[in-house]
Amino acid sequence: MTAATTSPLGGSSKEVRKNFVIALGMSFVLLQLLFLGNLSYIYGTQYKDSARFHAFKMLYVDYDGDVVGQSVLDAYEILRGNGYPSLIQSPVSVYPNPKDVKAAVCKGDYWGAVYANPGASSNLSAALATGSGSRKSLTYVWNGARYPTFAQSAIYSSIMTLIQVTKSSYYTRNASNVLATAPLSKNPASLQAFLDPIQATEINIKATQQGTRVLYNTVSMVMPIIQQFFFMMALNGISASFHLYTKLGPNKNGLLRLCVSLAYTFIGSLCMAGYIWAYRESWDVNSNQFTLSWMSIWLYMHINFLIVDILTAFIPLQFLPFCILTWAIINVASTISPFEISPGFYRWGYALPSHELYQVLVQIWSDGCENQLHRALPIMFSWWIACLAIVPFAMRHRCQTALAAEQAASGPIADDKTTASQGGSTDREATPHSRASSTRGIVPQGQRPTAESIRLENLAYGPSYPTPGVRQDEL
């Protein structure tokens, strides 16, 4: 009989192939499930969102009290449906002044508002009779800085549709009277007024027309998380190169890490606010808003640094990509669209820091409108304080694991003289541990890294990558 082929790593080649296929299959399945689950989650935020446009509330106040004001209601009855925002009529007694309507939209109670101007019908009648009256019958209010893409596609476009249908409703109600009384054939101005009877005035609380507006609540929310993860890998690699976890105690390491994280996120948030401002085009924002945006983003970035620090300390390396990707996806899913048009399940995202950051930024950019500070700041500071309370335990865990790695590496030294005389057998036994490891730069000279020390070192300093531009033998 033919002897079974032996693998250099020990065991038969058949057994090695079997284990390889099992390991590969597990990674294959787990990663497929990871991306399937995360992408299904974020796609779910947009599932049938247009069928929930009725969840957007728009205010209507009739200061006219005549045919023009009634034509707006007739138009809404034609448009009413799940795919159209709900038009909520309020009596003049609640909003006695048109400025009160704007204030209601600014406050965030409504996504938009339409009101019939005082005397709109009589002014239009004068325009039809003499050609000299005002045809500015309606005024509409909206906030272009509040989820700009949805404000443009769902609110602004719906208001434009309402105005167009209001014209048709006006013809239905009043065309016969106008044709009987107005001098349309003799007065071109009267004819023009009849052809375009309803005109509207726009009040956009904060015009946000720049192309980069689509990135504010999407890519810009996830990049800080990825940025902190990459810097954490660099910081861990530098800590490994300089043996910080064994040379300094947990308190000094924690203080050093806190100072470095504050400085890094301070500059990182400045850069993020900087590129938002650099590509603002004609967006009307000032230096005060820049500073407030910078400080808000700084808090958000530091929260994510602390979260990544905690995750990388306690989560096994093989599961860390699952945690980081999932954290990034659920955060961006909480800002990608308004909760009004997402399934109710997603409203748990109110508890996530990215959603609250975006609410703060909208208020800053809207000159104080859409005030959500009563909820946003407590949630963000709760995350920050909770992470500050947990991160010392993560630092202590890293230092203890690094010391254990050093002790494990010093164990086999006593057996060196005994094993040196065994020749080839020793070489074969050392083969599995002969691959390069950053442990060689962490443990003191004269100590040999072992499988256990390598494992512990990876737990203490992982994930990490070597310090760019610095040779390990120089440290």
Predicted regions and their residues:
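Short, membrane-interfacial amphipathic segments enriched in basic
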Residues: 1-11, 344-353
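Extracytoplasmic/periplasmic domains immediately adjacent to an N-terminal transmembrane anchor
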Residues: 2-211, 408-475
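Generic detector of leucine side chains in alpha-helical contexts
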Residues: 9, 24, 30-39, 59, ...
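Non-transmembrane, interaction-prone segments in cytosolic or luminal domains
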Residues: 145, 153-161, 169, 194-199, ...
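Membrane-spanning alpha-helical segments of multipass transporters and channels
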Residues: 210-229, 242-420
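Membrane-water interface of transmembrane alpha-helices
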Residues: 231-239
